[in-house]
């Protein structure tokens, strides 16, 4: 979720896509065809961003085995029709077949160009090759990191993520997740109203930041405040913080 959102331009559409992704990963959205139709008609997004989102939706939403592949995703993931990209994509695919973890796949993929990575996604999308879901997500995240890096014109560093756009998006995703956890924990306790209030404020903040677009550093405080509030609330409730670290 974090990586994919880091390549979507700020605006009302980003907030909408964030909600769709959240629903998809939570298993709430099970109509892949409707989701793809919605994605296809979104304005602003580049064909490649649509292709990556379509790939993620297809990986995550359970669907009928024979469901037709979508042309707009295939076209976006063909490596600009460059045969070099396709050659590299095949080499990368062979390496990915040997990987079993998300991090292993991401590490391998990061040494390839965006065109080769997109072509490799295309191979998997068109069912010309199969990898585990973990590995496919490693490929997606490597591609998004490269795109976000080129947008930020910063150099990738393998050990840690230094890209402020990705860190910013990660903090907002964390804030949303924490807000959701607070709402679930609130239940019928006396402090429920307070918890719901804090969670609701956090959601509104995240939505506003995604819609308006803010400086990547501006989300640090949001995440920290929310975690502080959650910790204080949990201490009063006598609940362990373990789940949300």
Curated annotation (Swiss-Prot):
Mark the transmembrane ranges. Answer: none
Protein purpose: Plays critical roles in virus replication, from virus entry and uncoating to assembly and budding of the virus particle. M1 binding to ribonucleocapsids (RNPs) in nucleus seems to inhibit viral transcription. Interaction of viral NEP with M1-RNP is thought to promote nuclear export of the complex, which is targeted to the virion assembly site at the apical plasma membrane in polarized epithelial cells. Interactions with NA and HA may bring M1, a non-raft-associated protein, into lipid rafts. Forms a continuous shell on the inner side of the lipid bilayer in virion, where it binds the RNP.
Keyword Plastid included in the entry's annotation: no
Note the subunit structure.
Homodimer and homomultimer. Interacts with NEP. Binds ribonucleocapsid by both interacting with genomic RNA and NP protein. May interact with HA and NA. Cannot bind NP without genomic RNA.
Looking up Pfam families in the UniProt record yields:
Flu_M1, Flu_M1_C
- Protein known as: Matrix protein 1
Where is the short sequence motif Nuclear localization signal located?
A: 94-98
Q: Where is this region: RNP-binding?
A: 158-245
- Coiled coil: which residue ranges? none
Work out whether the entry's keyword set contains Membrane. Answer: yes
Write down the InterPro entries for this protein, in alphabetical order.
Flu_matrix_M1 (IPR036039), Flu_matrix_M1_C (IPR013188), Flu_matrix_M1_N (IPR001561), Flu_matrix_M1_N_sub1 (IPR015423), Flu_matrix_M1_N_sub2 (IPR015799)
**UniProt main location, coarse:** virion
By its UniProt entry, which Gene3D superfamilies does this protein fall under? 1.10.10.180, 1.20.91.10
Q: A Gene Ontology MF term for this entry?
A: structural constituent of virion
Keywords per UniProt? Host nucleus, Membrane, RNA-binding, Viral matrix protein, Virion
What membrane topology is given? Answer: Multi-pass membrane protein
Query: From what organism does this protein derive?
Result: Influenza A virus (strain A/Guinea fowl/Hong Kong/38/2002 H5N1 genotype X0)
Q: Which SMART domains match?
A: Flu_M1_C
Additional information: Most abundant protein in virion. When expressed alone can form virus-like particles in transfected cells.
Q: Where is this region: Membrane-binding?
A: 1-157
The family classification in the record reads: Belongs to the influenza viruses Matrix protein M1 family.
Localization in the cell:
Virion membrane; Host nucleus
Per the record, GO CC terms? host cell nucleus; membrane; virion membrane
